[in-house]
């Protein structure tokens, strides 16, 4: 009796194990592909599965796979806008702020004078340049010590 019960238990466990290992493996999105060594003529290779198997997806779309639902159609007649608060909108992301106020700047640029409320533009002071600053120091040193190429050719002969 014990051997018979042990046999039934082993047979029951074997059926559970064989379902996982001998069934063809599924792959891709929503398990629509099958892992095979070589894809059939009606299938296309997409990517690799485990153990060097190819994920093959059928070229013929079957009805057993659920498709993505279509987007709902939006009718423009159904869209309405509420224009009741248009007058109170100031153009600022924060409510009740006035965008017409400008602040005095300490840097060079445009500032508002409080007496006349007119913008004034100030320019930065001009930078004075001298001949020493316009030429790089490496060029001035080499031009005084090295003769021009035509004179160099004459001196080496």
Swiss-Prot record:
Alphabetized UniProt keyword annotations: Antibiotic, Antimicrobial, Defensin, Disulfide bond, Secreted, Signal
Matches recorded under Gene3D superfamilies: Antimicrobial Peptide, Beta-defensin 2, Chain A
Gene Ontology BP terms: defense response to Gram-negative bacterium; innate immune response
Disulfide bonds: 27-55, 35-49, 39-56
Ranges of biased composition (kind: Low complexity): 110-121, 129-145
InterPro entries: Beta-defensin, Beta_defensin_dom
Domain of life assignment: Eukaryota
Compartments, as annotated in UniProt: Secreted
Broad class of the protein's primary localization: secreted
Signal peptide: 1-20
Any one cellular-component term (Gene Ontology): extracellular region
Region (Disordered): 109-157
Similarity-based family: Belongs to the beta-defensin family.
Stated role: Has antibacterial activity.
Annotated protein name in UniProt: Beta-defensin 125
Lineage of the organism: Eukaryota, Metazoa, Chordata, Craniata, Vertebrata
């Amino acid at each position: 009796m014990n051997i018979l019960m042990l046999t039934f238990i082993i047979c029951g466990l074997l059926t559970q194990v064989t379902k996982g290992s001998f069934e063809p493996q599924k792959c891709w999105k929503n398990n629509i592909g099958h892992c095979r060594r070589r894809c059939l003529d009606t299938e296309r290779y997409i990517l690799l599965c485990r153990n060097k198997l190819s994920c093959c997806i059928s070229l013929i779309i079957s009805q057993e796979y659920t498709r993505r639902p279509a987007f709902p159609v939006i009718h423009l007649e159904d869209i309405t806008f509420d224009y009741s608060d248009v007058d109170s909108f100031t153009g600022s992301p924060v409510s009740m702020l006035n965008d017409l106020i400008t602040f005095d700047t300490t840097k060079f640029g445009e500032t508002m004078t409080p007496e006349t409320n007119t913008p004034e533009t100030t320019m930065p002071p001009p930078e004075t340049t001298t001949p020493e600053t316009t030429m790089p120091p490496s060029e001035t040193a080499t031009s005084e010590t090295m003769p021009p190429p035509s004179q160099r050719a004459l001196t080496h002969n």
